[in-house]
Amino acid sequence: MTTIDEVPGMADETALLDWLGTMREKQPVWQDRYGVWHVFRHADVQTVLRDTATFSSDPTRVIEGASPTPGMIHEIDPPEHRALRKVVSSAFTPRTISDLEPRIRDVTRSLLADAGESFDLVDVLAFPLPVTIVAELLGLPPMDHEQFGDWSGALVDIQMDDPTDPALAERIADVLNPLTAYLKARCAERRADPGDDLISRLVLAEVDGRALDDEEAANFSTALLLAGHITTTVLLGNIVRTLDEHPAHWDAAAEDPGRIPAIVEEVLRYRPPFPQMQRTTTKATEVAGVPIPADVMVNTWVLSANRDSDAHDDPDRFDPSRKSGGAAQLSFGHGVHFCLGAPLARLENRVALEEIIARFGRLTVDRDDERLRHFEQIVLGTRHLPVLAGSSPRQSA
């Protein structure tokens, strides 16, 4: 039995949600044995994510011997973050993202074309779809796509018990160094021969009057590549799992595809791919009246915030028709670090679900298939999701 002092693993979702509910009620701000502070309630999580002056995104502040990674946008605070984000923001405007829909649909149909009655959703669609799209945006060749999965898989497999452990920072660097070296080589190529892609835009850009060097551009590209495919890979699996648990929504989506965006949004709240986000304190502060010292790590539980009854009515019920009452689901972050690629992730998952329904009607999770595997840490979702293609809801009515 999990105690209040033990954080359950991501693979046991029931135990994790029970623990988060207990913490929201009994210890909404809590320090673990590693000295990391955890925040569980929606209002408090939102406050931490919004206040970048007090809660920095740079984890190296509290890791002995670590130094900031130039260009790693999700670890950079304003005002540098604002300037760096502006470099690629035009690639993520609503119009630009909307223009990607035909390509996303073509890729999705192509990937599903050879799927049989039984297949692994992650291998067939959830991984290759977002990798293809983000790699094309960056200008990376198809022959390298499989390698990206190896790198991201190695990253989420790193044992991360103590996030302040200097050895952990070294292990992360060991995993990311080959990816960064690969992207650094691509940056050098684009600097010599620029094209119409995000890497070319990065190497030619100026931030505060100076050009980004290849290391900064490569680190920025690393962040875009990893975030650009892990989120959709995990989210699409979570959508199918959730609809499998609530099958009436397969029929509702088939009858009215206009409901699909709300389904995607509700799954984001219900099962966020990244259930927690970390910050570090720049000064002594308080959260919900609890003193927190300077230079410590603060772990905000987005999954818990999204299940907070003070923010969402009946939060443990999956309800795509719910009205938030003004409370935001925080799965893409909040404030200046709100995920740049959120519109792309929403579009990819909407199109993917539309095409799944058009081809199969519905999918059923094959729980007896030994390939079914959940991530143990970092992300909430399935590494492999075996599914069975169902008959069309219109045919089985």
Curated annotation (Swiss-Prot):
Record GO terms (molecular function): heme binding; iron ion binding; monooxygenase activity; NADP binding; oxidoreductase activity, acting on paired donors, with incorporation or reduction of molecular oxygen, NAD(P)H as one donor, and incorporation of one atom of oxygen
Swiss-Prot/TrEMBL keywords: Antibiotic biosynthesis, Heme, Iron, Metal-binding, Monooxygenase, NADP, Oxidoreductase
Cofactor: heme b
Covalent S-S links between cysteines: none
UniProt keyword NADP, yes or no: yes
EC number: 1.14.13.154
Entries under PROSITE patterns matching the protein: CYTOCHROME_P450
Catalysed conversion reaction: erythromycin D + NADPH + O2 + H(+) = erythromycin C + NADP(+) + H2O
CDD domains in UniProt: P450_EryK-like
Biased composition (Basic and acidic residues): 307-322
Gene3D superfamilies (alphabetical): Cytochrome P450
Subunit architecture: Monomer.
Known function: Erythromycin B (ErB) is not a substrate for this enzyme.
Family from the record: Belongs to the cytochrome P450 family.
Entry protein name: Erythromycin C-12 hydroxylase
Naturally occurring in which organism (per UniProt): Saccharopolyspora erythraea (strain ATCC 11635 / DSM 40517 / JCM 4748 / NBRC 13426 / NCIMB 8594 / NRRL 2338)
